[in-house]
Each structure stands twice: as structure tokens, then as C-alpha cells.
């Protein structure tokens, strides 16, 4: 299976968006005049996932932290890099610069000794933002999507990783095959005492208990724990470097057995104890790869106890776009032995095999989800995972889908005869469901980074915007990118989680573009 890395990048960005800003407090409003240099001030943990080119194309994941001084300077930091399984640990960030426009868009340049990397960013608040890697220098050519979250330095102790956590790690196994690894663990003072995981490793399903593991300082860089929240841990036999964001979120990058990255988020006490407590519409998005190529599925369902209804699913499988409306044999279960873990299954469009997913809720409102649909041969039909979130704040309409939004998508694009990664980050003002803004897009080998594309387009909302009427009507979005007089239209199907967050995937019936992403309100 060819891994579609939007499954890795968007998981991180989506879960961050669904689980709030992650700063440990109330998200402050922007300055009355908009964002500025002082909007980025403090330590921020970042993650990106994508590709790099040094003689040949290879997969690349980064996790690290940088410190911004509120005046346009990066004063320090550290990062860990996994390049298709080749790990470089504890790379010092020696300096850098950044700029923030009033709309929250800007750039960050991180200096790594004699070399540098550059990110295009859009702030979603002063606590967090979305980014793409748009490094294009003689020393490095790389792209990828991700995000950054303000850290709480008061949480920089291994003993602070305490309580139940839900995690989602995705990427490559030790043979460079796609892997999705999700689950939960209980930690007491930085020592993992129990847990459970579901792993889809290149189509092979493995589930099991997590027994032991300890969050500790890294002997390679012991001081980085107290300075940056960085350390090492082993989970289910795999080694990771971690970065503490705060007491409720930890970021991870594998340092053995492949290239996995993701977040663990504290699980709260609102998770449903049984299916009788389920009573909501849920939107979800998974992305990854199938036997045909890149894959995205975005959709929604209503859970009323163990009953599942009003199912909508939109699948883009290597350019084959299929819509599922309604379903039979639909049900949802919860695993009493592993709090927050459950499964949902439904059959539609005459499929011989139903769609099946396993999920882990971090609260009653959000969690992570992994596809475990099996083919007729008993192996996975896809390696894909993503986010699941309860729909709130409906009806969605021109009244509440309004204001300033950050925009990010990632996936595959076929341009100039070359298929490789495409990443976009931008900002748009939504007025009467019309879009107006700017964005950077990186079509890797084909066109390189293109800055400051004009963004226009529109959103069409059907019914109350949730899709809970069970009809074939979908919300749609048209995004038009214009640069130097040339315009490109990209059509999407959109599922609103709330007035502040939407999930989308494009509806192309060819392999020229296969992307998925988020629209997140700026605060």
C-alpha cells in the first residue's frame, strides 16, 4: 500500500483542533487590530509530516519546540527528525526569525547551525496554529503539514504525565509500509501501568495490552526535559522521543521500528460508560492508503444508544470518488474493559463487506478513529486513521459559519506529470458563506512553494448542516486559488463539527488531486 501522508499530518492537526488549543487555559482573543509579532510569544511544540528530497524522495517527520520572543526572533529550541526510519535526535535550534501578518498568516525560519528550515503558518489563536514545511534551500527541499501548540513549562517533568491518555501514532513501520497505531494507556507519575492498543500494520490487525513503560529524561540530552519538556519512553515495545505540551497533551516521534508520530491526550471523566449514554451526531475523517493508492473517508452518523442511523460517507480512493448514503447492519459498541474504546460498523451501497472502525474517546465529544474494514481475504481494506468528534452548535448556517478561519489541507497532487505531496496553509474570511483570503501551497517536486495565492470561493450548506436528515444532500465548498492571473478550482465535500471546525475532502474523480483538511475558526 502506498501511504498517503495526509493521514499522518491531518490527524495531528485535526485532533489539536477538536481538543481545543492545548495551552492549559482559556484561549485569549487576538489584538483588536488583528494578529502581530507579539501574538507568537513563548515556547511552542511543533510537529510536521511529509517528504524531503536529497537525491531521492523520502518520508520525513519532525517534532520539536521553538521559543519566540514576541518581537520577530526565535531564541532557541530543539527538534528530533525521523527520515524514513533514519533518526537524528536532539538537534539544537540556534535561532531564527518569524513574521505574523494581521490575518494570522506568516512564516517561521528556524536556524539549525549552518542550515535552516522554513514554515508557512496561520495562527488559530495566540496559543496555537497550523503550518506547512516550505523549506526550499540548497541544503534541503522538504514539505509537510502539521501544527504548533504553546507549551506550559510548569509541566516539564516526567512525573507530570499522570492519568489515562488516548493516543494516535501513524506513519511507517520498519519496512516503510503504512502503519496506524492507536490506543490508551494509564500512567502514574510517568510510569505506564496498563493500557490497550489497536495496530493496523500494512493491513495486518494486531490488538493487545500495554503493560509497562516509563517517561524519563534522555541520556543523550538530560537537560532537555526541564528546558523543553523532552524525554524518551517505550510504549508497546516501540521507542519514542516525547515533548510535553502541558498536563493534558504529549507529542511523540518514534525512534525505532519505523517512523510513527502523533499525540497523546488526557482522557477525562466524561467518556460514556455504556452505549446508553451515546446520543449525538458524530463527524469523522480518516486518511491513509488502500491497495489502489491514497484514501480518504469523511462522513457522519447518529448514535442513539447502540443504534446507528443517518450514515453519510464520502470516499476518495485513488481518485475514485464514491458517496454512501444510508446504511444497513449498523451498530456501535463500547468496550467495558478499556474505557473509551469502541467500534462502529455499517454497510452501504451494496458493499459485501461493511465499513468497520475502532475508536478511542478522550472525552464524550472527541477522540481518534482507525479503519479496520476487512477485505474478503480477511486483511485490511485500508490503513487509515483520523479524528472523530460530536457535532455541536447546529443548525449550521450563514449566521454562525462566519468570521475568520484558518485553512489547511494535505495529500497527493499530480502536476506537470509528477505525483507527490501537496500541502496548503492559509486564511479566509467567511462572509455570507463566501471565502476571501490568501494561502501558501507547496506542490513539492512539481512546482515548489507558491506564496500568497488569492483564495476565493463559497460554501453551500444543505438542511441544518449536520447531514442528520439521512438524505444524499451534502455540504460543499469551492476553493479557487489564483496566482499571476491563473486560477485553479478545487471542490470539496464538507462536514461541520461545530461553527468553529469543519472537516473536508476533495471530490475529484481523477488522480490529479487527493487532499483532505480542516477549516478552523481563528480566536
Per-range role (PLM):
Residues 1-17:
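Sec-dependent bacterial lipoprotein signal peptides
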Residues 19-523:
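Mature soluble binding/inhibitory domains
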Amino acid at each position: 500500500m502506498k501511504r498517503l501522508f495526509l493521514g499522518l499530518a491531518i490527524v495531528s492537526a485535526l485532533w489539536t483542533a477538536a481538543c481545543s488549543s492545548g495551552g492549559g487555559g482559556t484561549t485569549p482573543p487576538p489584538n483588536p487590530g488583528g494578529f502581530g509579532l507579539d501574538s507568537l510569544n513563548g515556547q511552542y511544540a511543533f510537529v510536521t509530516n511529509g517528504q524531503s528530497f536529497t537525491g531521492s524522495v523520502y518520508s520525513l517527520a519532525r517534532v520539536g519546540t521553538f521559543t519566540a520572543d514576541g518581537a520577530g526572533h526565535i531564541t532557541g529550541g530543539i527538534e528530533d527528525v525521523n527520515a524514513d526510519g533514519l533518526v537524528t535526535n536532539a538537534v539544537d535550534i540556534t535561532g531564527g526569525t518569524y513574521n505574523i501578518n494581521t490575518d494570522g498568516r506568516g512564516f517561521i525560519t528556524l536556524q539549525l547551525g549552518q542550515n535552516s528550515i522554513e514554515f508557512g503558518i496561520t495562527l488559530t489563536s495566540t496559543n496555537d496554529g497550523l503550518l506547512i514545511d516550505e523549506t526550499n534551500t540548497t541544503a534541503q527541499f522538504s514539505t509537510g503539514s502539521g501544527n504548533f501548540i504553546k507549551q506550559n513549562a510548569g509541566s516539564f517533568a516526567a512525573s507530570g504525565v499522570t492519568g489515562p491518555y488516548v493516543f494516535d501514532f501513524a506513519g511507517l513501520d520498519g519496512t516503510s509500509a503504512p502503519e496506524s497505531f492507536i490506543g490508551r494507556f494509564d500512567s502514574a507519575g510517568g510510569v505506564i501501568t496498563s493500557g490497550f492498543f489497536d495496530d493496523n500494520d500494512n493491513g495486518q490487525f494486531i490488538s493487545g495490552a500495554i503493560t509497562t513503560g516509563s517517561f524519563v529524561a534522555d541520556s543523550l540530552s538530560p537537560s532537555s526535559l526541564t528546558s523543553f519538556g523532552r524525554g524518551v519512553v517505550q510504549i508497546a515495545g516501540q521507542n519514542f522521543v516525547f515533548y510535553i505540551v502541558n498536563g493534558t497533551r504529549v507529542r511523540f516521534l518514534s525512534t525505532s521500528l519505523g517512523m510513527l508520530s502523533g499525540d497523546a491526550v488526557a482522557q477525562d471523566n466524561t467518556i460514556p460508560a455504556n452505549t446508553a449514554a451515546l446520543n449525538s451526531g458524530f463527524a469523522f475523517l480518516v486518511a491513509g492508503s488502500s491497495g489502489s493508492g491514497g484514501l480518504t473517508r469523511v462522513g457522519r452518523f447518529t448514535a442513539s444508544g447502540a443504534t446507528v442511523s443517518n450514515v453519510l460517507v464520502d470516499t476518495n480512493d485513488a481518485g475514485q470518488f464514491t458517496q454512501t448514503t444510508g446504511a444497513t447492519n449498523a451498530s456501535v459498541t463500547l468496550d467495558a474493559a478499556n474505557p473509551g474504546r469502541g467500534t462502529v460498523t455499517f454497510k452501504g451501497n451494496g458493499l459485501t463487506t461493511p465499513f468497520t472502525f475502532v475508536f478511542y474517546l478522550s472525552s464524550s465529544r472527541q477522540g481518534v478513529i482507525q479503519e479496520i474494514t476487512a477485505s474478503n481475504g480477511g486483511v485490511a481494506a485500508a490503513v487509515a486513521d483520523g479524528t472523530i468528534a460530536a457535532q455541536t452548535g447546529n443548525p449550521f448556517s450563514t449566521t454562525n459559519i462566519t468570521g475568520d478561519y484558518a485553512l489547511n489541507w494535505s495529500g497527493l497532487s499530480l502536476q506537470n506529470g509528477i505525483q507527490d505531496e501537496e500541502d496548503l496553509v492559509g486564511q479566509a474570511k467567511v462572509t455570507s458563506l463566501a471565502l476571501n483570503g490568501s494561502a501558501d501551497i507547496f506542490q513539492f517536486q512539481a512546482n515548489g512553494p507558491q506564496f500568497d495565492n488569492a483564495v476565493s470561493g463559497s460554501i453551500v450548506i444543505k438542511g441544518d448542516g449536520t447531514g442528520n436528515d439521512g438524505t444524499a444532500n451534502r455540504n460543499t465548498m469551492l476553493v479557487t486559488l489564483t496566482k499571476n492571473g491563473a486560477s485553479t478550482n478545487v471542490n470539496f465535500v464538507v462536514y461541520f463539527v461545530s461553527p468553529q471546525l469543519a472537516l473536508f475532502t476533495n471530490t475529484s474523480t481523477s488522480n490529479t488531486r487527493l487532499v483532505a483538511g480542516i477549516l478552523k475558526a481563528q480566536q
